[in-house]
């Protein structure tokens, strides 16, 4: 589980996330509390030539009431205080990113996916976020199977508010509805 806004991935790609003394911040979300500057001069140069198509299963923004810390933190074991801290650190990170990287938009749908990896991809790379469920439904040609089915069972372990935020069972249910099929979670 991650909730560092994609910083760990970006550090591996050569980005510098620096504290007030010019040192790399600690790994994980806790390092964000010391972040004051982001530099890309050591980033892998080939990144500029790459296009990324990211399968994203949620539409949550990076921060706020529907952000990754508030919505997904509890399922990752975060306490209320940890959620407040991570929310604050991610908001500061987004502001710092916006100073040097014009594509930074923490409110864009999907930026809160995978603990903020969506934000990292959109801000620091040539990426587009695509609905993970739409991508999978297309690649597996599930529509052909649903058309001929009597009943559709998603196998989702728990249907909750997060399910409605773009998870696979909703995509399957919408497709089944198109053909008037009964769906069980």
Regions found by a protein language model. Name each.
Residues 1-8, 117, 161-172:
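Short glycine/serine/threonine-rich phosphate/pyrophosphate-binding segments
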Residues 2-50:
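Glycine/threonine-rich beta-strand-loop-alpha-helix active-site module
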Residues 51-59, 154, 184-185:
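Short beta-strand segments
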Residues 58, 62-101:
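Acidic, glycine-rich loop-and-beta core segments that form the ion-binding/anion-interacting portion
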Residues 59, 127, 157-161:
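Short glycine-rich anion-binding loops that position phosphate/pyrophosphate groups of nucleotides
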Residues 85-152:
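Oxyanion-binding "anion nests"
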Residues 150-151, 157-185:
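C-terminal non-catalytic interaction/assembly regions of soluble proteins
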């Amino acid at each position: 589980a991650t909730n560092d806004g994609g910083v760990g991935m970006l550090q591996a790609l050569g980005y510098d996330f620096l504290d007030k003394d010019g040192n790399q911040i600690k790994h994980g979300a806790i390092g964000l509390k010391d972040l004051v500057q982001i530099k890309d001069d050591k980033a892998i140069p080939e990144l500029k030539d790459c296009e990324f198509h990211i399968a994203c299963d949620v539409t949550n923004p990076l921060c706020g009431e529907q952000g990754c810390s508030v919505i997904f933190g509890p399922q990752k074991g975060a306490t209320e205080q940890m959620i407040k801290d991570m929310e604050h650190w991610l908001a500061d990170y987004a502001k710092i990113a916006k100073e040097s990287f014009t594509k930074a938009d923490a409110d864009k749908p999907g930026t809160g996916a995978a603990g903020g990896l969506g934000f990292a991809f959109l801000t620091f790379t040539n990426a587009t976020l695509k609905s993970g469920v739409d991508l999978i439904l297309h690649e597996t040609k599930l529509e052909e199977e649903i058309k001929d089915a009597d009943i559709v069972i998603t196998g989702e372990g728990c249907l909750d508010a997060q399910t409605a935020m773009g998870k696979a069972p909703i995509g399957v249910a919408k497709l089944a509805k198109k053909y008037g099929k009964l769906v069980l979670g």
